Amino acid sequence: MKPAARETRTPPRSPGLRWALLPLLLLLRQGQVLCAGAAPNPIFDIEAVVSPTSVLLTWKHNDSGASECRIENKMESNLTFPVKNQTSCNITGLSPGTSYTFSIISVTTNETLNKTITTEPWPVSDLHVTSVGVTQARLTWSNANGTASYRMLIEELTTHSSVNISGLKPGTNNSFAFPESNETQADFAVAEEVPDANGTKRIPVTNLSQLHKNSLVSVDPPSGQDPSLTEILLTDLKPDTQYNATIYSQAANGTEGQPRNKVFKTNSTQVSDVRAMNISASSMTLTWKSNYDGSRTSIVYKIHVAGGTHSVNQTVNKTEAIILGLSSSTLYNITVHPFLGQTEGTPGFLQVYTSPDQVSDFRVTNVSTRAIGLAWRSNDSKSFEIFIKQDGGEKHRNASTGNQSYMVEDLKPGTSYHFEIIPRGPDGTEGLSSTVNGSTDPSAVTDIRVVNISTTEMQLEWQNTDDASGYTYHLVLESKSGSIIRTNSSQKWITVGSLTPGTLYNVTIFPEVDQIQGISNSITQYTRPSSVSHIEVNTTTTTAAIRWKNEDAASASYAYSVLILKTGDGSNVTSNFTKDPSILIPELIPGVSYTVKILTQVGDGTTSLVPGWNLFCTEPEPVTSFHCEVVPKEPALVLKWACPFGMYTGFELGVRSDSWDNMTRLENCTSDDDTECRTEVAYLNFSTSYNISIATLSCGKMALPAQNICTTGITDPPTPDGSPNITSVSHNSVKVKFSGFEASHGPIKAYAVILTTGEAAQPSADVLKYTYEDFKRGASDTYVTYLIRIEEKGQSQGLSEVLNYEIDVGNQSTTLGYYNGRLEPLGSYRACVAGFTNITYNLQNDGLINGDESYVSFSPYSEAVFLPQDPGVICGAVFGCIFGALAITAVGGFIFWRKKRTDAKNNEVSFSQIKPKKSKLIRVENFEAYFKKQQADSNCGFAEEYEDLKLIGISLPKYTAEIAENRGKNRYNNVLPYDISRVKLSVQTHSTDDYINANYMPGYHSKKDFIATQGPLPNTLKDFWRMVWEKNVYAIVMLTKCVEQGRTKCEEYWPSKQAQDYGDITVAMTSEVVLPEWTIRDFVVKNMQNSESHPLRQFHFTSWPDHGVPDTTDLLINFRYLVRDYMKQIPPESPILVHCSAGVGRTGTFIAIDRLIYQIENENTVDVYGIVYDLRMHRPLMVQTEDQYVFLNQCVLDIIRAQKDSKVDLIYQNTTAMTIYENLEPVSMFGKTNGYIA
């Protein structure tokens, strides 16, 4: 080194680098340390003390004058520290296992002395033995920095032999097998592959046993193992030997660090878990476990078996052995010694008995139905286990005994068993089993029963006291005639066929199992006799002669039970017993369907399986006679006859005339008191004789008919089409010409000529009471001026109703009470003619015509005729006329008053000329007293009130209903809607399309609360549904049945199953609830033109008798509340459509009761009269009969009484009406009528 390079400077502060001597300057460059001393003496004898991170240098020199020591780092800079007489230097902070070159330079002589030193690697840490076996041990340690490899020294502490293993790489798994030589020292190194292009690769070993013995194998650690650990497995060690393992860490040049050691001892060989298997009387198999884990040295096992009087020795090299030549039921002590070479390990021990010998002569000694005895022989066993198994089953129980015999009890009779016996040694060791089979004796059958018997078959069942299988039952059936039938069954039942009907058999059953037969048992049983056939019945009205046949061979001993039942209800009429094949049954009911059932019986009461039977009917009782009643003003006859005795399904009604013949079946007839039948024959001709026959029908039979000749009544003559001709004769007379009326409704009895000075309105019967005197005094502008009686003229002049008549009016003639007075000059007169088929005179009123009781029709009025001026004195004539008229009026009023008084006493209500009141308002608290007053004397007061209502509204015009095109739309020609209140439909193609027989009716809240209409006709169904749609109807109240008393009262206008179209309206029923008193139906009504629809509910009251009233008031009241509850859900402007047949009687009663309930609840008053009056001003004949009028008052009384009793909520409000009074049956009631009966 040049002097220029030797300069002194302060050393840098570098962590980890310390100087032991402050005057010394240390310079590091790639492991070099330069240290300079003073010249002239050179440096010699350099020594070093090395550790993993430091080097202590010491040296000698002879330069006592050295003033400094310099250490140079030629790569960086030179550092110089003044030193004086220093001969050592401690260098720290070095890296373990690293080679360094140190140079010491003398400053004086510039001479250099170099020294290369490698620091020690760190010693291993965490050295421990992870597992130790008999010949193996596994050691692991943690790697140290700077370690390139490890060397292991293993010493056997007993023999002091050792093995040196080098080349162990950090982080690897190694395996080393100890050599078998007796060398005290051996060295081994890791084997490696030839380096490839990527460097040296260790041998990957997966099966260490495949490597050559004594080789050291190193493999890469498995994935997941800590790479900082190194492991070595030492194999082929000596058992039960102590070893010392010392680990040296080595630098790359072989420099070793401080050693670390671990002393361990291998386990000795040991036998454990010695077991004996497959133990028999003379042998057994032994198994055990060994802890030997080596592979180089073979281990052997020496077995010593000692017991009884001899022992057995055996040597094997595996952990099992078969020991033979042993004695039965002997206790043996077994020892298993392990030997590894000459070294004996820890032995294993076992003490075990051999099995006893198999028993001999195992046999069945005795047998019964419930037990089997067993016996056997054995020489070396004192305990035995017996297993008992039923054939086909599993071992279900076992028994133990110390004897050499055993009785097995509680067995099943007739059952095969399998017995197995096993001897047991003193410790319970089992010997070989022995088996024997045995069967119990079968038991006799019990409870033999005949479960089914027919004419030729017998089904038998019996019981057995056990459930044993394999039974065979032998059956023998023997009859009295000696015939024998044999058969077998494997079940406890059998069906035996080919038997003889009605025969007694002796049945015997023998049980058998495994060809062992048990005790027999027997019963006797008859087969059933055959049913009778060819049943013939001859009947009268009350008897039946019955005969039959039975073709069985044993039929001579048969008896017969004859049962007569009513067909339908099955009630027993009579039961008879006979031994003959015929019988006469008396005291039957005529016209009744009977069932005769004949059971054949034999011996002990065994009967035929099914009876022979036949249906028959007694002859119906004939109708003895009947009488005819004429229906006033109807082309009909009412027929009445005594109800025949017995039952009948109807009657065949024959009606014959000269040109007409009709047979009608009456399903039934109306009976007032169950003693008299009645029916109405309609659609006949007036005033015609008919040959009528009535025959009783029942069960398809018809009795002899009863016959009679009946003549129909008469009615008002047909209204003539033309009007009379009137011409002026003088200033006070005219001439009236007319043709006779048609006589199809009865012979014309009289004609009345009527004059009027008023409007040409259609006259009514009311005008017949007015005379010339009434006209003259101004009481009426219409009067009867002349009367022609056909009977008289017919006798004297031979005139008939087809002739033309000419009457002089004003000739001052008198006919009965009518004066043909002179006419007024300058007057305008019109004439009409009244024709009579029946004319009645009021003898108490000057012989005037009684229009109410006469059958009359009127021609239209003629055109007006004007009279000329009277040339005479007019004033006197006028005065005389007026005076005369007053006198006549007074007399007529007196006569009428007298008649009125008489009629009231006789309860005959007649027409009153007094103008009736419009209202009779009564307070609720006074109504009961009023009701009692009116009810007195057979409802006389109510009759007078009802009579006052008779003609209310009848004069109101009905022109639209009388148009020819509309007449066919009316069900009855006397129930026509008033023009003022009629319901008008939309006009479609014709001006009369707006007509339907219906009126708006006032309710409590509105004048159009209701629509009252007739029951639809087949030709008005479309109009009816058009009205429902156009008038926005949501509820229909129907108060009639479609057919009553055999007459159609209303067409069934609704669909029942599928939707139906009525013009543009489609109707579909969605539900129907049928109850005893009414039926509720729901519909959907849809207009096909605009596809709009709304719901509709029909309340069909079916308990209102024809021509009567409901049986109880609360029935109708609750029905009304049912309707009103529904109306709360629909639009308030929607009217309720109410109809019966004509739409006046029952319809008016329902509407009236609705208004009365509202009046009672809201006003605390009652006005039955006023409400009916109001209804009749909107539609004729509303509340049609007097009984209906009285019924309304009764309803009011019941409501008021219920309110007083605080029961209104219970009876009339919030009622689930569909469940009330469901079991009441309506009773027909008849009463007086006012107008047409609907």
Swiss-Prot record:
Record localization: Cell membrane; Cell projection, Ruffle membrane; Cell junction
Segments on the Cytoplasmic side according to the record's topology features: 898-1238
Impact noted for substituting C1140S: Catalytically inactive and substrate trapping with higher affinity for substrate
Tyrosine-protein phosphatase domain boundaries: 942-1199
One GO term of the biological process aspect: positive regulation of MAPK cascade
Any Pfam family hit: Y_phosphatase
Positions that bind substrate: D1106, C1140, S1141, A1142, G1143, V1144, G1145, R1146, Q1184
The Fibronectin type-III domain, residue ranges: 39-122, 170-266, 270-358, 359-443, 444-527, 528-621, 622-718, 717-803
Modified residues (Phosphoserine): S910
Purpose: Tyrosine phosphatase which dephosphorylates or contributes to the dephosphorylation of CTNND1, FLT3, PDGFRB, MET, KDR, LYN, SRC, MAPK1, MAPK3, EGFR, TJP1, OCLN, PIK3R1 and PIK3R2. Plays a role in cell adhesion, migration, proliferation and differentiation. Has a role in megakaryocytes and platelet formation. Involved in vascular development. May be involved in the mechanism of contact inhibition of cell growth. Regulator of macrophage adhesion and spreading. Positively affects cell-matrix adhesion. Positive regulator of platelet activation and thrombosis.
Protein name: Receptor-type tyrosine-protein phosphatase eta
Taxonomic path: Eukaryota, Metazoa, Chordata, Craniata, Vertebrata
